[in-house]
Amino acid sequence: MYMYWGWGEEPTMKTITLGSTGITTPQDAFGALPIQRISTDEAVRLLHRAYEGGMTFFDTARAYSDSEEKVGIAFEGMRDRVTIATKSGAKDPESLASDLETSLALLKTDHVDIYQFHCADRVYRPGDGTGMYEAMQEFKRQGKIGHIAITAHKIGVAEDAVASGLYETLQFPLSYLATPREEALVEACAKANMGFIAMKGLAGGLLHNSRACMAYMTKFDNVVPIWGVQKKSELDEWLSYMDQGTPALDEETLAFIASERAELTGNFCRGCGYCMPCPMHIAINQCARMSLMLRRAPSQAWLSEHWQAEMAKVDSCVECGLCMTRCPYELPIPQLLKANRADYLRVLAGEVSVG
């Protein structure tokens, strides 16, 4: 399905129905994690610009500091015009209920459209003894939430959530670097009439070709990507596809994606940060992928005194393994840190050129 802005005009942006929720939205949505890093005035202007540009789906979370508050201020008085999804990482029903009440107050609303278990490490079910799913059912009965949903980073948890038939949407990382297993997860959601909300569409900042990222998402008729935005220039890039039309996944784009996959497959850090904090204060989510950042972004910023000091902390790693127990991608983080540190030193010494 496509959106039409006027009689006789060409179709512009593909629209998606999120499974059994019945929620329809352009396949171009707003991830509100980054707005916690900007002022309230800046965030509200950005959110208004997103809405005026055609975005109607906004995803936030209790864990994103003041993101919910900013979303609430932006859409007060126009709640029925937007879809709001939020999340809680609570581990017991009482905390889950408290989080929901806080979210509702900050969002200035009496309900959220989609309420998600945040970064779940298990799939809650009725009768499992936790009371978590029953709490969600009660929230829904009270009209405080529209749909029960889940977000995950571990594919085994995501697959279990789909198979359970208990959730109306799944939020999971998806980009054109996806593995066959991850793409099969999207198809499983489609067969289960379950909406798929795609996070990490830029693979944690490693991908820079927005047109290719957007075109890849059009492969799927059940996927809504949420793009993390904190700058007007970033937003305008995504909004441009509302006017220009959904980019085609043509031969040129497919060839580009193939070249990117060849470079970036394997054990690379996505920068999600779930491994942190580190007992030795290492910025793992950047240090473990520094070699990629040096080569895929302007390198000068990563060679600053600040990042030289941060990379030096890698030498203090005691290989306690705590980070590996937290990593949803089961990466060998201490080895990645050492390899990136060694490469960084070679770059600093001028032995390796990164352009």
Model-derived features with residue positions:
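Glycine/proline-rich, positively charged
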Residues: 38-41, 52, 91-197, 202-205
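Generic structural signal for well-ordered alpha-helices
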Residues: 13-15, 47, 68, 72, ...
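Short hydrophobic/aromatic-enriched beta-strand-loop microsegments
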Residues: 81-84, 167-175, 246-252
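Structured C-terminal cap/extension of enzyme domains
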Residues: 51, 55-56, 184-198, 202-355
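Alpha-helix-loop-beta-strand connector modules within alpha/beta enzyme cores
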Residues: 69-86, 134-142, 191-193
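Conserved, mostly hydrophobic/aromatic
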Residues: 18, 30, 58, 71, ...
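N-terminal binding-site loop/beta-alpha segment at the start of enzyme catalytic domains
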Residues: 2-82
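Short catalytic-loop micro-motif centered on adjacent basic/acidic residues
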Residues: 56-61, 85-86, 146-149, 169-172, ...
